[in-house]
Swiss-Prot record:
Interacts with the major capsid protein/MCP. This is Small capsomere-interacting protein. Residues 100-139 are annotated as: Disordered. It comes from Saimiriine herpesvirus 2 (strain 11). The gene is SCP. Its main location: virion. The lineage of its organism: Viruses, Duplodnaviria, Heunggongvirae, Peploviricota, Herviviricetes. Belongs to the herpesviridae small capsomere-interacting protein family.
């Protein structure tokens, strides 16, 4: 039964000693102690450090193999935008949406569209559905 327990990872060196300004150190420092004993907190910090290093290495690998990271890219774009520009954009967008959300009735549809043969405004016909394009299964 003793082999079922997951062994603790071997951590060689400390991240704090290698680079005290690294982003992982900042994330490690915000780990709350809550009601853990100092020994439990030390073990939790070590395990969290292993997780952060693994996550950081995986993110670096994904970034180099698959291009830019979307989350990092979006955060960079948001940082470059001014807060006043964001509020102005949201106000203009809400005004644009409120004017464009009026639903046209059938009477406002141009007569050139309603008089076209084969044009169905009521909905898709059965020949246009995806199910009709499927091949029958062989038995």
């Amino acid at each position: 039964m003793h082999r079922l327990r997951v062994t603790d990872p071997v951590v060689q060196g400390k991240l704090e000693e290698s680079d005290s300004t690294h982003e992982l150190v900042k994330r490690l420092e915000i780990l709350p102690q809550n009601n853990m004993t100092p020994e439990e907190y030390t073990l939790m910090k070590r395990n969290y450090l292993v997780f952060l290093i693994a996550q950081y290495n995986f993110d670096q690998y994904i970034e180099t193999t698959h291009g830019i990271k979307r989350k990092k890219h979006i955060e960079g774009l948001k940082a470059n935008l001014k807060p006043s520009a964001l509020s102005a954009d949201s106000a203009s967008l809400s005004g644009l949406l409120s004017t464009s959300l009026t639903t046209p009735s059938l009477s406002s549809t141009p007569t050139s569209l309603t008089s076209m043969p084969g044009l169905s405004i009521s909905g898709p016909s059965t020949t246009d559905t995806i199910d009709s394009k499927k091949k029958p299964k062989a038995k």
